[in-house]
């Protein structure tokens, strides 16, 4: 069984809340701050933050104060490949990569929903993100059995 996450921006706390789909029935919601979009380097993972949550299929970095490596890596990679062709990047997001303005929560939410989650689900490009996590993330997954996919259809 693979983990499947949905995300919501909490504008009051300026954090990206992540939780497994169907967490309400299991009583296991969790949230964590997203951190910087353009930083591809994984940060240290807090040993106690979220340690009580054992969510199948999630890497340990899902509970990091900087957010999951999957989102950080994916965001950074997307920006790096499109920053020179900024017509493909929303204007506020392009400015954010240059440090010129603050991105609104609406634009950030649209970016994640449209660019990262919706397109990959509908177009069947989940393998790209799976490889990014398993190949690019230095953190071990919570579950040992393979395959453990971070964002995949169950």
From Swiss-Prot:
**Taxonomically, which superkingdom?**
Viruses
Q: Does the keyword Transferase apply?
A: no
The biological processes this protein is annotated with in GO are: DNA-templated transcription; symbiont-mediated activation of host NF-kappaB cascade; symbiont-mediated arrest of host cell cycle during G2/M transition; viral genome replication
Signal sequence bounds: none
One Gene Ontology cellular component term attached to this UniProt record is:
host cell nucleus
Q: Where is this region: Mitochondrial targeting sequence?
A: 68-117
Q: Which UniProt keywords apply?
A: Activation of host NF-kappa-B by virus, Activator, Apoptosis, Host cytoplasm, Host G2/M cell cycle arrest by virus, Host mitochondrion, Host nucleus, Host-virus interaction, Modulation of host cell cycle by virus, Transcription, Transcription regulation
Q: What is its main location?
A: host cell
Quote the PTM field.
Answer: A fraction may be phosphorylated in insect cells and HepG2 cells, a human hepatoblastoma cell line. Phosphorylated in vitro by host protein kinase C or mitogen-activated protein kinase. N-acetylated in insect cells.
What is the annotated localization of this protein?
Answer: Host cytoplasm; Host nucleus; Host mitochondrion
Q: Which InterPro entries match?
A: Transactivation_prot_X (IPR000236)
Q: How does it assemble?
A: May form homodimer. May interact with host CEBPA, CFLAR, CREB1, DDB1, E4F1, HBXIP, HSPD1/HSP60, NFKBIA, POLR2E and SMAD4. Interacts with host SMC5-SMC6 complex and induces its degradation. Interacts with host TRPC4AP; leading to prevent ubiquitination of TRPC4AP. Interacts with host PLSCR1; this interaction promotes ubiquitination and degradation of HBx and impairs HBx-mediated cell proliferation.
UniProt function note: Multifunctional protein that plays a role in silencing host antiviral defenses and promoting viral transcription. Does not seem to be essential for HBV infection. May be directly involved in development of cirrhosis and liver cancer (hepatocellular carcinoma). Most of cytosolic activities involve modulation of cytosolic calcium. The effect on apoptosis is controversial depending on the cell types in which the studies have been conducted. May induce apoptosis by localizing in mitochondria and causing loss of mitochondrial membrane potential.
- Similarity comment: Belongs to the orthohepadnavirus protein X family.
Write the protein's name.
Answer: Protein X
Q: Which organism is it from?
A: Hepatitis B virus genotype D (isolate Germany/1-91/1991)
Source species taxonomy: Viruses, Riboviria, Pararnavirae, Artverviricota, Revtraviricetes
Please state the gene responsible for encoding this protein: X
């Amino acid at each position: 069984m693979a983990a499947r996450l949905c995300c919501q921006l909490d504008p009051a706390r300026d954090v990206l809340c992540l939780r497994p789909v169907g967490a309400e029935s299991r009583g296991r919601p969790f949230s964590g701050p997203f951190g910087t979009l353009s930083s591809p380097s994984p940060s240290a993972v807090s040993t106690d933050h979220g340690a009580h949550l054992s969510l199948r299929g999630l890497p340990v970095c899902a509970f990091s104060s900087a957010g999951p490596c999957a989102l950080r890596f994916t965001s950074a990679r997307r920006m790096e490949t499109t920053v020179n062709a900024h017509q493909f990047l929303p204007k506020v997001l392009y400015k954010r990569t240059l440090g010129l303005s603050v991105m609104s929560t609406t634009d950030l939410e649209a970016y994640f929903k449209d660019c990262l989650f919706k397109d990959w689900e509908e177009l069947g490009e989940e393998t790209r993100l799976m490889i990014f996590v398993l190949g690019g993330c230095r953190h071990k997954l919570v579950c040992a059995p393979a395959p453990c996919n971070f964002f995949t259809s169950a």
